[in-house]
Regions:
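Non-catalytic terminal/accessory segments
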Residues: 1-33, 37-214
Length: 214
């Protein structure tokens, strides 16, 4: 079902009775489309819930991908919908972190080639790159697909955001110089990146929290 444009609608249609079952029995159960998370006080109870889900899906002509089924205890971290939950700490998942760093790296190479091929100046090159990622990270007001409205309200640490910030700065310096080394900090200072519309995720996160904490 995942990957289909109407997958969320289909999941809601087929799983609404299962949602009602868990809700009526006061079981800690969360679902987004066909991603399901269930909490329990002990392993026996959890296995019982898992079997209930399996039975319901089989009776409905559906199935579970065994490669995406995990049982974990509260001391372990779990990744769910792009988040990593580790005790009371909620951060961006390692998989999501790897994906966004990959996109940044590919974009940096692309903009470096574009800059050289078209003989584009440093500032407009970085402005264009930042426009792309600022739209992804911050979007427009109430853009639910942007990181600002998807991740910011739920994470409670800036560890991953800080890592992305540093990686983004490194890649943008590479776009200008064509190399990765410590001298880039002098050749392309932070103020220059800001002049090119670069926005720090950590800074934007704290601004978002200050504006939205009641």
């Amino acid at each position: 079902m995942a990957g289909v444009p109407i997958s969320s609608f289909l999941a809601n249609y087929y799983l609404k009775d299962m949602d009602r079952y868990f809700e009526n029995n006061n079981i800690k159960y969360f679902r987004y489309a066909d991603d399901i998370l269930v909490f329990s006080n002990n392993i026996e109870e959890l296995i019982e819930y898992k079997n209930d889900i399996h039975k319901y899906l089989i009776d409905s002509g559906l199935n579970i991908n065994p490669d995406k089924e995990y049982i974990f205890n509260p001391k372990e971290s779990v990744e769910f919908l792009g988040f990593e939950i580790n005790g009371r700490i909620v951060d961006i998942s390692k998989m999501q972190l790897k994906k966004i760093k990959g996109k940044i790296k590919r974009s940096a190479r692309k903009f470096r080639r574009w800059k050289l091929k078209k003989n584009v100046e440093d500032i407009p090159t970085l402005v264009t790159m930042n426009k792309k990622f600022n739209n992804k990270f911050y979007g427009k007001e109430d853009d639910e697909l942007s990181w600002r409205y998807y991740f910011f309200p739920l994470i409670n640490t800036t560890d991953s955001l800080h890592e992305i910030d540093l990686y983004m700065q490194e890649c943008q310096r590479y776009v200008v110089t064509g190399v990765h080394n410590k001298k880039n900090y002098e050749k392309v200072p932070y103020d220059f990146l800001k002049k090119c519309k670069y926005k720090s995720l950590v800074h934007e996160y704290y601004e978002f929290i200050q504006k939205n904490v009641k």
